[in-house]
Amino acid sequence: MSNYQFTKPAGPFYLAELAEISGSTLYEGKGEAFTVSGLAKLSEATTHNLVMLHQKKYLKELKNTAARACIIGPEYVKFAPDSMYLLVHPNPYKAFALIAQAFYPSEKPAGFIASSAAIETSAVIGSNCYIAHGVYIGNNAKIGSGCQIGVNTYIGDGVTIGDDCLIEDNVSIRHAVIGKHVVIYPGARIGQDGFGFASDASGHYKIPHAGGVIIGNHVEIGANTCIDRGSLDNTVIEDWCRLDNLVQVGHNVKIGKGSIIVAQVGIAGSTELGEYVTLAGQAGVIGHLKIGKGATVLASGKVYKNVKSGDRVGGHPAVSISDWQKQIRFLKTAIKPKKSPKS
């Protein structure tokens, strides 16, 4: 259950309302007027909490839960207690997300500009923005309407931020154009120089980075994630991408629409990801590669060559999942101690 010290849920809601919000179907039309006061885990729920079942391993908890209402996939309906009201959805996790948004809507403060914020006179600030203490907004920067900018955040010269963005505390943004409905979590760094040098025996010679960073609409950038600007071209993050905490995106990288980049991933310069690519935790990709649409790199996979659309790869170096599994089986066999011959 949530900690009401920090988050108090809206509601209560009738189950019929939650069915409409989530696009779910009330099983056998039962429970329309049942009230739901909040969301909870199966093991912690009380009578008027709504729970969710989306994996078979939780069937025992479903049987023993005190909750009277459950979001459930159609394949699990037959396992639910007879006394339980069911919201049936082919993707229970999506239904849960939509219902959770209703219980915990984003709080948007009224327009406010702190007296300690430093805003250059040529900057343009949209209507109803919340700009916290210690914020700096540079020359010719443009901030869209309804934006929230957290404490001690730096917005550099010429940066453009679209409407209804949330830029949290201690973020720095330079050389960037950011779309609408973007969320950037604390400590993120966007638009700094990339790691580009020309080297010989006499030293390392810096390559100036004259490009920028382009971030689309409905993107989320995790805490302490770094996105370097391009050298001559731009670094691009397309619409609906999700970048977790502690991700490194090198200069000139392109990340296609809807891609998911999990924590501690590193993407070296000029690599291009197609749409809906997933890079799982601690995956690494060297520079100047292409990762095709819908491809997946499993956790800690290290990619040294192009990956085709739809492929799933893992290991170090990353290979197809079937080949990786063969390698693991071989290693297990190879390192297994041999029995001593009988004397």
From Swiss-Prot:
The active site is at H251. The keyword Nucleotide-binding does not apply. The lineage of its organism: Bacteria, Pseudomonadati, Pseudomonadota, Gammaproteobacteria, Legionellales. Pathway: Bacterial outer membrane biogenesis; LPS lipid A biosynthesis. One of its GO terms (biological process) is lipid A biosynthetic process. The keyword NAD does not apply. One of its GO terms (molecular function) is N-acyltransferase activity. The gene is lpxD2. Its EC number is 2.3.1.191. This is UDP-3-O-acylglucosamine N-acyltransferase 2. One of its GO terms (cellular component) is membrane. Homotrimer. It holds the Pfam family LpxD.
